Amino acid sequence: MAIVSSTTSIIPMSNQVNNNEKGIEDNDHRGGQESHVQNEDEADDHDHDMVMPGFRFHPTEEELIEFYLRRKVEGKRFNVELITFLDLYRYDPWELPAMAAIGEKEWYFYVPRDRKYRNGDRPNRVTTSGYWKATGADRMIRSETSRPIGLKKTLVFYSGKAPKGTRTSWIMNEYRLPHHETEKYQKAEISLCRVYKRPGVEDHPSVPRSLSTRHHNHNSSTSSRLALRQQQHHSSSSNHSDNNLNNNNNINNLEKLSTEYSGDGSTTTTTTNSNSDVTIALANQNIYRPMPYDTSNNTLIVSTRNHQDDDETAIVDDLQRLVNYQISDGGNINHQYFQIAQQFHHTQQQNANANALQLVAAATTATTLMPQTQAALAMNMIPAGTIPNNALWDMWNPIVPDGNRDHYTNIPFK
């Protein structure tokens, strides 16, 4: 009985142990499923990765030409597309990093060869903001066995328009197959380009393609500023033309001044410009005054000539002040003012010389009038009061003109 009871008691215990083990397995299975689902959720962030984390793309030049470029030209497929097919000459170099499939400091692209001219071999390397310029000749790339496998061309990006662009720090290496191999595959010519930036120089920040419209906005703002400058230049040109018109009017007035001047009398000139009215009245100048000839005739001639020179100098000084005023007021007076002033001064000198010759001729003529001179001396020797005034004027009538008689009424004869 005891044995049986012990046996029966052992059976339920063994069943309990089995059930416990089964429950532990179920919990482990359930926990495994939950952890697997959790791991799948965490792995969703990398489902679209083209390469594994930590992978770096640093191919050699031989690998770029023999594997990537040749397979692309031959039309073969790649398990992983690491190089983007892009016409990079349609974009500026600082826009390219956002379009590359991979790369941190250098970026790779398959580029179709676009010719600048339809019937020529020269490629078109002009972008939106500048152009790529080749430096040096092409270099042959050889394999480990020294077999030529391709060509390499180095280009530098210049911002602006050729040939006055500004050199930047963006550099590109263009790899292509030999020309005879391209014809062999009867494919469009394709090159493989590696773009990178020289370190230590900051030309333009690398921006995504969505922000590339800033360049167009900058061009529009630049165009508007250029149009504004042209408008201001046009207005300043019109103002300058108005000033030139005023200057021409002033020159005409000065010419009138020089033509209206006469030797006998006065000249009154009124010159008007855009700022103020300047009126200069030149006093009446008696260029020639006939004087009675006496023993001091030479002294009278010299004094008259000196007085005449002083008057002419005053006229020239007034004209020079007028010209100087016009120069200071106009700002850009033509040098013809000075030419007119010089002509006027030259004319005055000629008139002065002519008047001096007339005075000398008059003096020479007066020396021949000895009878009249003797009569004048004899009359001066007559005592005062013996000859009436009327008779005295009758004696002087041949010498003194009628027009200047009033000028000599105040001369005492005692």
Swiss-Prot record:
Cellular location(s): Nucleus
GO biological process per UniProt: flower development
Biased composition (Polar residues): 1-21
Gene null: resulting phenotype: Early flowering phenotype under long-day conditions. Hypersensitivity to cold.
Compositional bias segments (type: Low complexity): 233-251
Highest taxon, organism lineage: Eukaryota
Keyword Transcription regulation: yes
Region feature Disordered, mapped onto this chain: 1-47, 200-251
Xref: Gene3D superfamilies: NAC domain
An example Gene Ontology molecular-function term: DNA-binding transcription factor activity
NAC domain ranges (all copies): 51-198
Free-text tissue specificity from the UniProt record: Expressed in aerial organs in early stages of seedling development.
Induction behaviour: Circadian regulation with a peak of expression at dawn under continuous light conditions. Circadian regulation with a peak of expression around dusk and lowest expression around dawn under continuous light conditions (at protein level).
Positions of the DNA-binding region: 149-204
Matches recorded under InterPro entries: NAC-dom, NAC_dom_sf
Entry keywords, A to Z: DNA-binding, Flowering, Nucleus, Repressor, Stress response, Transcription, Transcription regulation
Biased composition (Basic and acidic residues): 22-47
One Pfam family linked to the record: NAM
SUPFAM superfamilies: NAC domain
Cellular component GO terms, alphabetical: nucleus
Domains: entry comment: The NAC domain includes a DNA binding domain and a dimerization domain.
Function according to Swiss-Prot or TrEMBL: Transcription factor that acts as a floral repressor. Controls flowering time by negatively regulating CONSTANS (CO) expression in a GIGANTEA (GI)-independent manner. Regulates the plant cold response by positive regulation of the cold response genes COR15A and KIN1. May coordinate cold response and flowering time.
Note: The gain-of-function mutant lov1-1D (T-DNA tagging) shows a late-flowering phenotype under long-day conditions, and freezing tolerance.
Name of protein: NAC domain-containing protein 35
Species of the source: Arabidopsis thaliana
Designated gene of the protein: NAC035
